[in-house]
């Protein structure tokens, strides 16, 4: 059965810890064409806000691997993204990501799926909630 409102509330185990490093922060800042931003350099850099996507998208793997949902990344469009921050990601943080399905709406052959991914340290400190809206075309319409 494809993803439906019945799946709202389903959550998946947290990802393996990801250690945020100065090198990865610098690499991401270069990809944003912002390598000279002092916030992203030095001895205690913070990660650019959108770096959270690196961690949040890793949590998507469990949802897309769930055979009951019949999801395929090749039939999915990332329509919206929001972040609610408690504090910035810093070099040295060991971060886990846990995904929860918040809302599912059907519009014809398309499922509009809202997911939240809670990023927290391995010590349980909540860092950020990344909320995404995905549009997925079901198999029968593909």
Regions found by a protein language model. Give the residues of each.
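Hot-dog-fold acyl-thioester-processing enzymes
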Residues: 1-80, 141
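HotDog/MaoC-like acyl-thioester-processing domains
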Residues: 1-3, 85-142
């Amino acid at each position: 059965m494809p993803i439906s409102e019945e799946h709202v509330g389903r959550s998946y185990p947290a990802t393996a810890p990801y250690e945020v490093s100065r090198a990865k922060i610098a690499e991401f800042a270069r990809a944003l064409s912002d390598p000279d931003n002092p916030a992203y350099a030095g001895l205690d850099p913070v990660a650019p806000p959108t770096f959270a996507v690196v961690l949040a998208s890793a949590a998507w793997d469990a949802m897309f691997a769930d055979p009951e949902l019949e999801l395929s990344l090749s039939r999915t469009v990332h329509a919206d993204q929001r972040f609610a921050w408690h504090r910035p990601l810093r070099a040295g943080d060991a971060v886990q990501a846990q995904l929860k399905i918040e809302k599912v709406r059907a519009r014809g052959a398309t499922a509009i799926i809202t997911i939240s991914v809670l990023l927290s340290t391995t010590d349980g400190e909540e860092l950020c909630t990344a909320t995404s809206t995905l549009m997925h075309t079901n198999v029968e319409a593909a």
